[in-house]
Swiss-Prot record:
GO terms for cellular component: mitochondrion. The lineage of its organism: Eukaryota, Metazoa, Ecdysozoa, Nematoda, Chromadorea. The gene is mai-2. This is ATPase inhibitor mai-2, mitochondrial. The keyword Mitochondrion applies. It comes from Caenorhabditis elegans. Mai-2 and tin-9.2 are transcribed on a dicistronic transcript where exos-4.1 is the upstream transcript and tin-9.2 the downstream. It comes from the Eukaryota. Its main location: mitochondrion. The keyword Mitochondrion applies.
Length: 109
């Protein structure tokens, strides 16, 4: 009968053996099943893993480009709003000056 420590030692060795390997090396290695081609491992599994990596790289790159364009549009929009607000502010200040001039004129009468 095996002692607990010997069983644990044997299990550790088995786990290390089954989890060894790289991305696309087959089922149980590198993160689990990824389909029948990846399950087989070997060159086809590695090629499929490389294609997946490339797909997600391109997807992330496209998302970042979309985000950059969206933020640039937002900046342009807010710059336009800033100019509009400056013009409105100048109009209001001009109107206040006119009202103050009218008040002074009324006070002199």
């Amino acid at each position: 009968m095996l002692s607990v420590s010997r069983a644990a030692t044997r299990m550790t060795g088995m786990v290390a053996r089954f989890s060894a390997g790289g991305h696309g090396d087959g089922a149980g290695r590198g993160g689990g099943s990824g389909g029948s081609i990846r399950d087989a491992g070997g060159a086809f599994g590695k090629m499929e893993a490389a294609r997946e990596d490339e797909y997600f790289y391109k997807k992330q790159k496209a998302q970042l480009q979309e985000l950059r364009e969206h933020i640039q549009e937002e900046v342009k929009h807010h710059e336009g709003q800033l100019e509009n607000h400056k013009k409105v502010l100048e109009r209001h200040q001009q109107r206040i000056s006119e009202i103050e001039a009218q008040e002074r004129a009324l006070g002199k009468e």
